[in-house]
Amino acid sequence: MDAKVREVAKGFEYEAKSFKAYDMNGYRFHTDKHTRERPNRRSINSAVYCLGTDGRHYYGTIEEIYELQYCGLQGVKPIVFRCSWLNPETVRRIPSIGFVKVERASKYAGNDVYIMAQQATQVFFLPYACTSTEYIDLLKWDVVYEVSPRARLSPPKEEDYEPHINCNALDAAISPTCRSTT
């Protein structure tokens, strides 16, 4: 049996480190309390997204960040986030335009509030900017914006590539094996 698996099977110590902020997956995550208490804050880094094992989309805020310390010499120290989740039944997705909105007042009643830090994607909740009484129903909804990881470029999508390259335009010395597609 792998030594790290054996160490995890023994269980974790009864002490864990707690953090106000933690860097993971190219994001800087903060607890919601830390975000609210910072004077002159310029960013809100406590909102997260996670795809559940049930296939539902979970959005919420980080309440606590813990580093669990397992017994043994292997140094297994997983980071977990305790989150306050929004009710996944109220999430509205329009994949064709990449639009997601959530009802912030609708809280998830389940007990599974922990996720591994590696599972988290940072998001930002943007309230609708409308104040007109005509659109009063929109005021309870927030639009979800998925934050790009720092110092990482998003990988190109299939539609970013040209489907065919006209090799006649290429220098034969650079690509001698290329044949014309026309």
Task: Report residues per predicted region.
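Terminal interaction-prone segments of large eukaryotic proteins
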Residues: 1-182
